[in-house]
């Protein structure tokens, strides 16, 4: 009697939970003793049963998607067709059903696809890194580099100039410890140690400048039409642009080099932080937005049609025409107002110089002076604005980066940061003196030290002694003796009788009106008291008779605190 091979059919349990179909690679990498098929085989065949007897799988009336993947395999095509099962070979309790989800756990979509090879493969990948399922269809995805660890915390920047930034930074330490513990627990044996070792700043990651915009259109080219290049510096170039949507002109500052990881990156972010905190002020260049393109930072600022103060000074040198004393006082007063606003926010500029002061010329009909006009325009409708906030720092926790050495105070060079606001006053004095016609200041040497000792260089014009004394006071070697920005905006030299602004005149007028009202009130009281005293002295009998008549009059109380006389009319 010839023996026919008895085909074996894999049995799968239906008791698996639904979520097993979504398990990871580690869940599907099972051991032979843990497999439900092995347990069933042990019951049916005993210890002599072996996976090696398996030669093929029974056909199913419904083909799974994996069938088409296996058909492409050369090993699958070379297999002989399975013999049709006989009546005695088909287990009555295992009808032909579609492949169960446990079937996918066997990873039969790869070749070779014998149970023994699958188990050995499962053991091999059980302790390795997680991989994609799906066999050759997703084989290309496995070749991709390992994606970076994703954080649940969104990437945001912490503005160091906001009032609540200190509170956020103080609470960051606790969050770092908690998140580090969670990350250490989540790192398994299959992950490299470098994946779990995170820096402190990675726990709350900051949004960095580099942004991949290969699939995005340039915002600069889409939203703005470039007119001309109006300036350049260490940071980059400034372009005059028209926004296509509103038709207004803006100044777009673009960094020269890619800023990702460079020293200028922090300066650019510091400028954006300072602009966002300061908001809008008449004597600070207005900020609108900032973004990054191809690792370059772009900042959209207000366009000042008068250029910079440095350009005006260069033109004055060429034409031998300098700022007059009233113009110098107006320049000093307006920039002092801008510094007063910056200092009131507990910030310091740290880079005041002619190239960072911009001029805006406003054409306004001559309709008279109104309230508040002093903050919007100076003499001749010229407004001076402070710009380039890349060196701004906080007074309480300074991170000082030295600006231009020609306008740098000596105490900053000596790393004495106790009076940083007075360093801005020192730089402002030299800026005004430069506009007065002084020669360009040295970057070092004996003349540099003479200026720090309070000696001003000569200027080609005659200025009043009180104005010169004010400039000398602003560059005093003792920083404590220098006037503050608050004192400058109220200084008598800058607010002379002929140059008092409308607000100052209104305040003085209201004060005089209040004094006049008080005097009139006191005068009226004195007049009433004097008249009463004279009446008592001249007519004492009349006053006594009047009081007696009023007391003898019959009255009746009606209502609350109301006396009415009783009258009777007889018809």
UniProtKB/Swiss-Prot annotation:
PROSITE patterns referenced in this protein's UniProt entry, alphabetically: PROTEIN_KINASE_ATP (PS00107), PROTEIN_KINASE_DOM (PS50011), PROTEIN_KINASE_ST (PS00108)
Enzyme active site? 351 (proton acceptor)
Query: What does UniProt note about where in the body, tissue by tissue, this protein is expressed?
Result: Zygotically expressed. Expressed in regions of the embryo that are devoid of mitotic cells, such as the involuting mesoderm.
Report the main location listed first in the record.
Answer: nucleus
- Domain Protein kinase stretches: 224-494
Instruction: Describe the reaction catalysed, as an equation.
Output: L-tyrosyl-[protein] + ATP = O-phospho-L-tyrosyl-[protein] + ADP + H(+)
Annotated region described as Disordered, given as residue ranges? 1-101
Recorded coiled-coil stretches: 500-539
Function statement: Acts as a zygotic negative regulator of entry into mitosis (G2 to M transition) by protecting the nucleus from cytoplasmically activated cyclin B1-complexed cdk1 before the onset of mitosis by mediating phosphorylation of cdk1 on 'Tyr-15'. Specifically phosphorylates and inactivates cyclin B1-complexed cdk1 reaching a maximum during G2 phase and a minimum as cells enter M phase. Phosphorylation of cyclin B1-cdk1 occurs exclusively on 'Tyr-15' and phosphorylation of monomeric cdk1 does not occur.
Q: What is this protein called?
A: Wee1-like protein kinase 1-A
Q: Which organism is it from?
A: Xenopus laevis (African clawed frog)
């Amino acid at each position: 009697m010839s023996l026919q091979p008895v085909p074996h059919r894999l049995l799968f349990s239906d008791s698996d939970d639904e979520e097993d179909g979504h398990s990871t690679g580690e869940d599907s990498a099972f051991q032979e003793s843990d497999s439900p098929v092995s347990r069933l085989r042990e019951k049916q065949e005993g210890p002599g049963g072996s996976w090696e007897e398996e030669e093929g799988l029974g056909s199913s009336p419904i083909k799974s998607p994996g069938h088409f993947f296996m058909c492409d395999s050369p090993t699958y095509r070379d297999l002989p067709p399975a013999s049709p099962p006989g009546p005695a070979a088909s287990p009555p309790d295992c009808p032909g059903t579609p492949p169960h989800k446990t079937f996918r756990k066997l990873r039969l979509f790869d070749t070779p696809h014998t149970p023994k090879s699958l188990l050995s493969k499962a053991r091999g990948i059980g302790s390795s890194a997680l991989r994609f399922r799906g066999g050759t269809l997703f084989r290309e995805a496995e070749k991709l580099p390992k994606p970076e660890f994703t954080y649940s915390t969104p990437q945001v920047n912490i503005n160091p100039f906001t009032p609540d930034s200190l509170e956020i930074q103080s609470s960051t330490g606790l969050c770092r410890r908690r998140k580090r513990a969670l990350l250490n627990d989540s790192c398994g044996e299959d992950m490299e140690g470098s994946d779990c070792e995170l820096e402190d700043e990675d726990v709350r990651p900051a949004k960095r400048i580099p942004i991949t915009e290969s699939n995005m259109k340039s915002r600069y080219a889409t939203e703005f039409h470039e007119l001309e290049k109006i300036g350049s510096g260490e940071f980059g170039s400034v372009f005059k642009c028209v926004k296509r949507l509103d038709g207004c002109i803006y100044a777009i500052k673009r960094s020269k080099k890619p800023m990702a990881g460079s020293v200028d990156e922090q300066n650019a972010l510091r400028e954006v932080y300072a602009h966002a905190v300061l908001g809008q002020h008449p004597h600070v260049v207005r900020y609108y937005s900032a973004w990054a393109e191809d690792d370059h930072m772009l900042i959209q600022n207000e366009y000042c049609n008068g250029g910079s103060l440095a350009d005006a000074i260069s033109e004055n040198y060429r034409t031998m025409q300098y700022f007059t004393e009233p113009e110098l006082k107006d320049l000093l007063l307006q920039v002092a107002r801008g510094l007063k606003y910056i200092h009131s926010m507990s910030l310091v500029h740290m880079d005041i110089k002619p190239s960072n002061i911009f001029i805006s010329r406003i054409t306004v009909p001559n309709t008279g002076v109104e309230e508040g006009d002093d903050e919007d325009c100076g003499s001749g409708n010229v407004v001076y604005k402070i710009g380039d906030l890349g060196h701004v720092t906080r007074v309480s926790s300074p991170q000082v980066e030295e600006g231009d050495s020609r306008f740098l105070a000596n105490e900053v060079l000596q790393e004495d940061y106790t009076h940083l606001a007075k360093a801005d006053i020192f730089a402002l004095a030299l800026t005004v003196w430069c506009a007065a016609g002084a020669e360009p200041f040295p970057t070092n040497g004996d003349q540099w030290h003479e200026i720090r000792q309070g000696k001003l260089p000569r200027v080609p014009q005659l200025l009043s002694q009180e104005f010169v004394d004010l400039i000398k006071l602003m560059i005093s070697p003792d920083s404590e003796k220098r006037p503050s920005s608050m004192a400058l905006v109220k200084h008598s030299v800058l607010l002379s009788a002929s140059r008092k602004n409308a607000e100052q005149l209104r305040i003085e007028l209201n004060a005089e009106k209040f004094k006049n009202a008080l005097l009139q009130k006191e005068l009226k009281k004195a007049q009433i008291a004097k008249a009463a005293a004279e009446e008592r002295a001249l007519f004492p009998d009349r006053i006594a008779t009047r009081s007696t008549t009023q007391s003898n009059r019959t009255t009746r109380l009606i209502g609350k605190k109301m006396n009415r006389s009783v009258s009777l009319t007889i018809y």
